[in-house]
């Protein structure tokens, strides 16, 4: 399916829950993948993050945003999120 292809291409993250691959609902909106998520995943992957580490980072509250990175992406603050992700690489 299209979702499986997006996971394979690195545009989405999925994890196993009770043996079934799932994509967090917050990664999607009415138009598809949340704007800025694929680029953020690429930056984190290039910084050496595992899929588990990326999921944890995206859902961990960052008081400087405020909120979690995925919440910031969902409210169109992708540049701030991407800057923070890039800073992790150094």
What function would you assign to each model-found segment?
Residues 1-90:
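Non-transmembrane "mature" sequence context
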């Amino acid at each position: 399916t299209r979702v499986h292809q997006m996971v394979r291409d690195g545009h989405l993250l999925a994890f196993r829950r009770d043996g079934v691959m799932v994509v967090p609902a917050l990664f999607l909106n009415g138009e598809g993948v949340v704007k800025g998520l694929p680029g953020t995943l690429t930056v984190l992957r290039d910084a050496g993050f595992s899929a588990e580490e990326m999921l944890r980072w995206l859902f961990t509250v960052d008081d400087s945003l405020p909120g979690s990175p995925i919440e910031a992406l969902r409210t169109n603050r992708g540049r701030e999120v991407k800057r923070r992700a890039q800073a992790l690489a150094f």
